[in-house]
């Protein structure tokens, strides 16, 4: 797995794999962002009330999870 320092940040990690050590886990990030990170393999557009184009990475990836 990639080093923790090089992973994209995620404020709210949703579903995660259950591996040991914890650094081996991949998660789905629940953050809605202006642009998906480079390593995202399934970037989906999210409908918002503001009309601004926002996206969510819906694939399991390596993140630095805040929560």
From Swiss-Prot:
Keyword flag Disulfide bond: yes
Entry GO CC: extracellular region
Disulfide bridges in this chain: 10-29, 16-27, 36-43, 40-57
Domain of life: Eukaryota
Molecular-function GO term, any one: serine-type endopeptidase inhibitor activity
SUPFAM superfamilies reported in the protein's UniProt record: Bowman-Birk inhibitor, BBI
Tissue: Expressed in bulb (at protein level).
Alphabetical UniProt keywords: Disulfide bond, Protease inhibitor, Serine protease inhibitor
Site positions per UniProt: Reactive bond for trypsin: 18-19
One GO BP annotation of this record: negative regulation of endopeptidase activity
Similarity field: Belongs to the Bowman-Birk serine protease inhibitor family.
Role played: Serine protease inhibitor. Inhibits trypsin (Ki=12nM) and weakly inhibits chymotrypsin with (Ki=460nm). Does not inhibit bacterial subtilisin.
Name under which the protein is recorded: Bowman-Birk type proteinase inhibitor A4
Species, as recorded: Hyacinthus orientalis
């Amino acid at each position: 797995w990639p080093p923790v320092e090089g992973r994209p940040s995620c404020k709210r990690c949703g579903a995660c794999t259950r591996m040991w050590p914890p650094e081996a886990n991949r998660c789905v990030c629940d953050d809605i962002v202006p642009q998906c990170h480079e390593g995202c393999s399934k970037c989906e557009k999210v409908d918002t009330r503001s009309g601004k184009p926002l996206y969510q990475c819906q694939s399991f990836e390596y993140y630095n999870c805040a929560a």
